[in-house]
Amino acid sequence: YGIKEDEIVFVYVGRMAKEKNIEELLWYQKSVQKNIKLVLVGDGPYRTTLEEKAKEYQVTDSVIFTGMVSPDEVARYYQIGDLFVSASTSETQGMTYDEALAGGVPLLCRKDDCLKEVVTEGKNGWQYENESMYLECIQKWKEFSEDEKRRMRNTAVRTADQFSKESFAKRVERVYLAALEERKRRNVYAA
């Protein structure tokens, strides 16, 4: 893809649909330094529109659309990323967040309730609410030493371990069991 060694790579993996708000990432790309590439991995009904927006915003030199990739290649794309970026506020399960973290890729995501238990600001990523916050997070990343970046990547992996499918299933099970216990308790008192 012609990515240079000294370039910072932001990677997005997922379906290209309007509700994913990828257009925001393209808009912000106008404001970032020229040594940052945005790699958009995936396909979907909104891809053509996004490619047109990239031209309109004059960011085609710094944005790469990979198209659909096979599931066994996805990990490779996470690995080229310095940060995983997402502007979506419509995630319910957020598997791509987990995949990025598992690959040691810190997150830079639009603030979303589904991430409040996942993102620890400045430790495994950041959440932003607007363009200035987005740019501020990028500046922090750029100012980190290699050791700080390594620590952040390691924390990302530990976070993914904590939120793996197994631990997610156990958390859901605890919630259901607590709900059943509460229901039982209420039925006892109702009788």
List the predicted regions and their residue ranges.
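A conserved mid-protein helix/loop that constitutes part of the nucleotide-sugar donor-binding site
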Residues: 8-31, 36-38, 45-51
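Short hydrophobic beta-strand element within catalytic cores of glycosyltransferases
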Residues: 106-109
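Nucleotide-activated donor-binding/catalytic signature segment of Leloir-type glycosyltransferases, i.e.
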Residues: 51-69
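Short alpha-helical donor nucleotide-sugar binding micro-motif in glycosyltransferases
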Residues: 68-69, 76-81
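A charged, aromatic-enriched C-terminal amphipathic alpha-helix characteristic of glycosyltransferases
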Residues: 150-185
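Short alpha-helical segment that forms part of, or immediately flanks, the ligand-binding pocket
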Residues: 75, 93, 97-102, 116-117
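Aromatic "clamp/platform" in nucleotide-sugar-dependent glycosyltransferases that forms part
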Residues: 89
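Conserved acidic donor-binding segment of nucleotide-sugar-dependent glycosyltransferases
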Residues: 121-132, 140-146
